[in-house]
Amino acid sequence: RRAQKLRAQAMARPFSSGAKAKLLLVTQPERIPQSQIYPFHHYAADLKRLYGAEVREADLWDVLGNKPMVATGATVVAFQSPFDISDDDLFRLIESLRAQNPGAIIVCLDWFAPTDLRNAARMDPLIDFYVKKHVLRDRSLYGKPTLGDTNLTDAFNRRFGIDEPEQ
């Protein structure tokens, strides 16, 4: 697949010394989280031409396993995480990213359901930006309670008559 090939290429090269901007994506290899990452690779040539930016990638599980990253010294590090990442793993991940990319802007790329913000509050003091993969078309729905913790659980709970507390 094209996406896998582009990911492998981005994981195999360090940043060049002449890059104006260096974007390191620390990502999960699974299909749904990768759908958030593919556009960065698809438009990598345009990012380089227009902004002098290089895009590289590292596997989240390798970083958490303390495997050395090929690309370090990024100016921006954008990372994904599992929704159930432990506090210890989250703190260790961010500490490692900051140590290997001093002065970098740290961004969380949240690939979860549109109304699932379970990690936003605990990441707030640790990162510079929190980016959702997608948002609800009708943004007024964000102020309304759901049955369960996301719009997806709300839809299933209502459809199948599952009793969940409003949140």
Kindly label every feature range from the protein language model:
Residues 96-167:
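Catalytic core of nucleotide-activated saccharide and alditol-phosphate transferases
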Residues 1-120, 124:
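N-terminal pre-catalytic "stem/leader" segment of glycosyltransferase-like enzymes
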